[in-house]
Amino acid sequence: MNLLNLLNPLNLFRTESKDTTPEGLTLNPEPDNPIPGHYFITERNEPIVSEIITAGNPILKAVAAPVTAFDKKLKFLILDMKKTLYEANGVGLAAPQIAVSKRIFVADDGESGFEAYINPEWQPDGDEMATDSEGCLSVPGLFGEVTRYARVIVRYQDIHGKKKVKKASGLLARCIQHETDHLNGILFIEKAISLHKGPKDEE
C-alpha cells in the first residue's frame, strides 16, 4: 500500500502528542486554517486522491475561508481535487469535502470541461427554477429532489487569481449552486424536497 495514500495531506488527523511528522511532510503549514494533524506534502511529483469526508464531520458545516494566496500549495490542492473528482466519478467537489475549509470547488459537467472556481459568488440569471435529483459524495447512498435556479452567473478567480465571469445553465448551474452551498456549510439534504436511496458513488 502506498504510504502517501495513507498519509493523505488534507485529511489525516493525529492524536498522539509527539512529533511523528513523516519526512517530506510539513505539519500545519497554514495557521489560518489549522486542522490537527493536517499534513501538506511539500515535495512530490504527482497529485493524489484525497479522502472525501462525510456528513457528520464539522468541517462540512463550517463557512469556508476565502483564498488569499495563489501559490504552489493552491496549485497542488487543485490538482488533488481534480484527481479526486475523477476518481469518484463526480461532477463537482468542494474543498471542504476533503477537509480543507477554503472557498474552492472544482467541476466538470461533461460539456464545459474541468474548471476550478476560487472564491466563487453566483447570482440568478432570470427567475426560472428547476427541480431535479441530486446526490453528494459526502452523503453517500442518498439522493433527493432539489429546486434551484435554472441559470446562474458566477464570478470567481482562476488558479492564477484572475477574475472571471461565466454564465451557466442546466447541470453546470445546478452544480455551481450545490458546491457553493458546501462552501457555506450547507448540504443538499437540507434543501431536498424528498430523499431516496441510490448508488453511493455519485454527485
Regions found by a protein language model. Name each.
Residues 2-203:
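Positively charged
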